[in-house]
């Protein structure tokens, strides 16, 4: 039988150790490469951090599998058993250019169910963590259940790309929403955006394409505070594929989906 309390304690220890290693690396020169496009950055620290987790998971939990952004884990085609979904540095562009607004993100799943979610804002030493059925926390502070919000008073996290000409959604769909809400924010790290939704600092987050390692941990957090998340089509996540994401408190999710996203059909 899986000892989830032990896994939770060990994962928290590892994520803080990895954060300390990243902090130390900020005083050293980075090796920066590009992946799918010139703005899709990866550094030697991304790769080293992913390897840090893989080495420890394989040694401590040899039966567990790993889905990592940098491709050093396993080839995952199902979520059978225990699977760690890891983004060693979510917000690499921020890490390179700002040395802030990035996070380590780890979701741990068993047979497709999110059991543990960890998002560590390294620079601010804020660890958002959730254990299925036991609540969500920021460090030692328990996160409150999300409150209902009217759209006119909502803070929406959205990248400006989605209200300009792009190939994923007509810019006219979301522009009226941006005008209607109280304000918008963009942090450049999907994990931190989802953590901020779970913490009630922002009311909703919308984006057109995220990989499983971008959203897995955040979804575990949202489960524990009563948040809602789907694709922009209203479909559930597979946690194996790239998806669009609409996440927020239930009332805001419902309003955005019904009045803006579903209406576009």
UniProtKB/Swiss-Prot annotation:
The keyword Cell wall biogenesis/degradation does not apply. SUPFAM superfamilies: Carbohydrate phosphatase (SSF56655). The keyword Metal-binding applies. GO terms for biological process: inositol metabolic process; phosphatidylinositol phosphate biosynthetic process; signal transduction. Its cofactor is Mg(2+). Mg(2+) 2 binds at residues 87, 90, 214. Coiled coil: none annotated. Keywords: Hydrolase, Magnesium, Metal-binding. Substrate binds at residues 69, 89-92, 185, 214. Disruption phenotype: No visible phenotype during 5 hours of growth, decreased resistance to oxidative stress caused by diamide. It is an enzyme of class 3 (hydrolase). Transmembrane segments: none annotated. InterPro entries: Inositol_monoP_metal-BS, Inositol_monophosphatase-like, Inositol_monophosphatase_CS. CDD domains: IMPase_like (cd01637). Hydrolyzes myo-inositol monophosphate. Catalyzes the dephosphorylation of GMP and IMP. Belongs to the inositol monophosphatase superfamily. This is Inositol-1-monophosphatase. It comes from Bacillus subtilis (strain 168).
């Amino acid at each position: 039988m899986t000892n989830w309390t032990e896994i939770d304690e060990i994962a928290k220890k590892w994520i803080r150790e990895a954060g300390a290693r990243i902090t130390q690396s900020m005083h050293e020169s980075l090796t920066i490469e590009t992946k799918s496009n010139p703005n899709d950055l990866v550094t030697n620290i991304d790769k080293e951090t992913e390897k840090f987790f893989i080495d420890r998971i394989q040694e401590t939990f040899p039966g567990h599998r790993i889905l990592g952004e940098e491709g050093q884990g396993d080839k995952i085609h199902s979520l059978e058993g225990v699977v760690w979904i890891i983004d060693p540095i979510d917000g690499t562009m921020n890490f390179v250019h700002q040395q802030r607004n990035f996070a380590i993100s780890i979701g741990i799943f068993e047979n497709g169910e999110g059991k543990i979610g960890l998002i560590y804002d390294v620079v601010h030493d804020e660890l958002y963590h959730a254990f299925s059925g036991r609540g969500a926390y920021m460090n030692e502070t328990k996160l409150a259940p999300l409150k209902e919000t009217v759209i006119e008073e909502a803070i929406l996290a959205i990248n400006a790309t989605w209200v300009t000409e792009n190939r994923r959604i007509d810019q006219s769909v979301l522009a009226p929403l941006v005008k209607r809400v109280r304000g918008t924010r963009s942090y450049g790290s999907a994990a931190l955006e989802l953590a901020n939704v779970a913490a009630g600092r922002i009311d909703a987050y919308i984006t057109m394409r995220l990989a499983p390692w971008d959203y897995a941990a955040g979804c575990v957090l949202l489960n524990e505070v009563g948040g809602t998340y789907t694709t922009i089509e209203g479909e559930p996540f597979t946690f194996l594929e790239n998806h669009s994401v609409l996440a927020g408190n239930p009332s805001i999710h419902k309003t955005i989906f019904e009045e803006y996203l579903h209406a576009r059909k």
